[in-house]
A protein has these predicted regions:
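Short, glycine-/Ser/Thr-/acidic-enriched flexible segments
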Residues: 22, 64, 113, 131, ...
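Short, well-ordered coil/turn elements that cap or connect secondary structure elements
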Residues: 52, 83-85, 119
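Class I S-adenosyl-L-methionine
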Residues: 66, 130, 193-194
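A donor-sugar binding/catalytic signature common to diverse glycosyltransferases
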Residues: 92-138
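Leloir-type glycosyltransferase catalytic cores
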Residues: 137-225
Length: 225
């Protein structure tokens, strides 16, 4: 297993693939995969056959993975069989935003890392269903096979993404997270405010922003973007 600091010493272009937890309901319910290894096998096989030979693949484990599945050994063995072991790097450390920033694009199932990549104007390929898997923002089946993405990654339409992001922030998200005391406190407080509001799904202060964003979003969708 290599470290992120060592990987950065090379100037070769690379794609970034963040792993998700096997217990993630987004994987179990909204993707064609049951096990994360199945997705890894698809990505490695496609990369071996269709990516430019000078291109590398950086795979990062999920920071909350419990280690019961040895993804490092699985990736090593599979990459060796495909003859691309020297082009595939698996890490468990390092900054995800930095990995996105240096990449040519991001391949994933449906991780929220996709939103981080769109924020950085990076091409994103989704192998599963996701709220952000929208034509003009990402590439995916049935329009674009993964085999094509390696050589023709497309950056997201930023006006479309900004409109999508405003709607998402106003109607679907609350501040906070599930992984820290501060994050949980913020999430509870913001959720209570959302439920107590007479407009549960649309707070009055956000109404004007959302309507403007919907108009922008519709404008781009009319042109098939």
């Amino acid at each position: 297993m290599e470290r992120w600091a060592d990987f950065q010493k090379s100037d070769d272009p690379y794609f970034f693939y963040p792993l998700q937890l096997v217990s993630d309901s987004q994987v179990q319910l909204y993707s064609p995969y049951v096990r994360v290894q199945e997705a890894i096998a698809d990505v490695l096989t496609s990369f071996a056959l269709h990516a430019h030979p000078k291109t590398r693949l950086l795979i990062k484990n999920h920071p909350l993975d419990n280690g019961l599945i040895n993804y490092g050994e699985f990736i090593k063995g599979f990459a060796e069989e495909l003859g691309i072991y020297d082009r595939v790097t698996y890490v468990e450390d390092g900054s995800t935003p930095d990995m996105i920033a240096g990449s040519r694009g991001v391949v994933l199932i449906n991780s929220t890392v996709g939103l981080m990549a769109l924020d950085q104007d990076k091409p994103v390929y989704c192998m599963g269903r996701s709220i952000y898997n929208i034509e003009g923002l990402t590439q995916s089946l049935p329009t674009t096979p993964l085999d094509v993405f390696w050589c023709a990654p497309k950056a997201p339409n930023q006006p479309l993404y900004r409109a999508f992001k405003r709607i998402l922030n106003a109607q679907a998200l609350v501040h906070g997270n599930f992984y820290s005391a501060q994050g949980i406190s913020l999430a509870v407080a913001d959720s209570v405010r959302r439920f107590e509001d007479s407009h549960v799904h649309l707070q009055p202060k956000h109404r004007q922003i959302v309507m403007r964003s919907r108009d922008e979003f519709s404008k781009y969708r009319k042109f098939g973007i």
